[in-house]
Amino acid sequence: MSNGIIVQVIGAVVDVQFPQDAVPKVYDALKIVSEGQSKGLVMEVQQQIGGGVVRCIAMGTSDGLRRGAEVSNTGEAIKVPVGMKTLGRIMNVLGEPVDEQGPIGAEDNWVIHREAPSYEDQSSATELLETGIKVIDLICPFAKGGKVGLFGGAGVGKTVNMMELINNIAKAHSGLSVFAGVGERTREGNDFYYEMKESNVLDKVAMVYGQMNEPPGNRLRVALTGLTMAEKFRDEGRDVLLFIDNIYRYTLAGTEVSALLGRMPSAVGYQPTLAEEMGVLQERITSTKTGSITSIQAVYVPADDLTDPSPATTFAHLDSTVTLSRQIAALGIYPAVDPLDSTSRQLDPLVVGQEHYETARGVQTVLQRYKELKDIIAILGMDELSEDDKLVVARARKIERFLSQPFNVAEVFTGSPGKYVTLKETIRGFKGILDGEYDDLPEQAFYMVGSIDEVVEKAKKL
């Protein structure tokens, strides 16, 4: 293929001059061939500026790059290994192993830029996916082949919730999973690897990491690398779980290079192509008639503001949203899911059944009423409430505590063994509280337990 030379380097953005008749296409991968510390560095063409010059984003650090260095055009987009050989391995954005376990040796390599499945190939799913987490199964149930977002500010438990979901679903589901770590802490990636190893599900997970310390080009593309691997499993007729932690960093990486690529910033300094970049990724995460991709994405919410353009753009693509709240975390209730702010398209009597629907709505009604009464209680005290309202408050406080649950992955912090609660048990428990069957039990008994039977046992000890 044709060769060119570097004419300009600004951070992660590199301009390369090629002969006029051999200009690389947009998204072609270029490789540095000159000797030096950056030999073998891959860059992706983003723009053709004219005069044979193309503007690229470096997929690795641009330290040591110099003008005049020679670059070769590979003639195709970045290709990554796909298929069964990727399971149990940790790879980077280019699909190269970073776990020191030798080459991947996959039979097939796919380019990371692909078309989304056409309308006629897509399938709509209504089968529920049980997670074993009470608040999620009750209020915002997941669909098999659906998209879920875990929204939360810094430190409210997105990654811990994600780990628990992987632990519960990957074990019970016994399907294949792909984990894309996009711009998160290296330590979390390390913890995740050993967590999977200890629970013997490592041979069912492919891991792709582009951590916080990587250049923006790397973080911008690593989500596509993970998605491509998941698509291969789906097209083989399997049901895949795709975990992305964190989708906000994908947007952020786009923001970092956007200005360097010469684009005018839009609202809050985000890239003007925010919606399109998000759409390109999200439209590919879909289920077809051959197999399904169920995706669970952590979404960092900057400054706890859900109206920020990045989380707001993500909302549009999801079937279920699990919103984590700092106020609930402050009460010591974990998982800190806000039952009044979390939604699901599946919460429909035609999908989940009448009993589940009425229980979930009943729980939300009681909690909403309690929220309204809080102001009165703060000013006048509990004694000023009517008998009915006092009962609502008592039940709401029990429900709040019953929505908490000890996690398997958090045993080290809580000291209590994790609990998996079936959907049937969850509905039975909350229905009982709403019907007043447990009005005589103290509210402490409802905190950090699994099923309602454990509440009764705990109450005897209090």
Curated annotation (Swiss-Prot):
Its main location: membrane. It is a peripheral membrane protein. It is found in: Cell inner membrane. HAMAP family: ATP_synth_beta_bact (MF_01347). NCBIfam families: atpD. It comes from Tolumonas auensis (strain DSM 9187 / NBRC 110442 / TA 4). F-type ATPases have 2 components, CF(1) - the catalytic core - and CF(0) - the membrane proton channel. CF(1) has five subunits: alpha(3), beta(3), gamma(1), delta(1), epsilon(1). CF(0) has three main subunits: a(1), b(2) and c(9-12). The alpha and beta chains form an alternating ring which encloses part of the gamma chain. CF(1) is attached to CF(0) by a central stalk formed by the gamma and epsilon chains, while a peripheral stalk is formed by the delta and b chains. Its EC number is 7.1.2.2. It comes from the Bacteria. The gene is atpD. It holds the Pfam family ATP-synt_ab_N. Keywords: ATP synthesis, ATP-binding, Cell inner membrane, Cell membrane, CF(1), Hydrogen ion transport, Ion transport, Membrane, Nucleotide-binding, Translocase, Transport. It catalyses: ATP + H2O + 4 H(+)(in) = ADP + phosphate + 5 H(+)(out). ATP binds at G152, G153, A154, G155, V156, G157, K158, T159. Transmembrane segments: none annotated. Produces ATP from ADP in the presence of a proton gradient across the membrane. The catalytic sites are hosted primarily by the beta subunits. This is ATP synthase subunit beta. Belongs to the ATPase alpha/beta chains family.
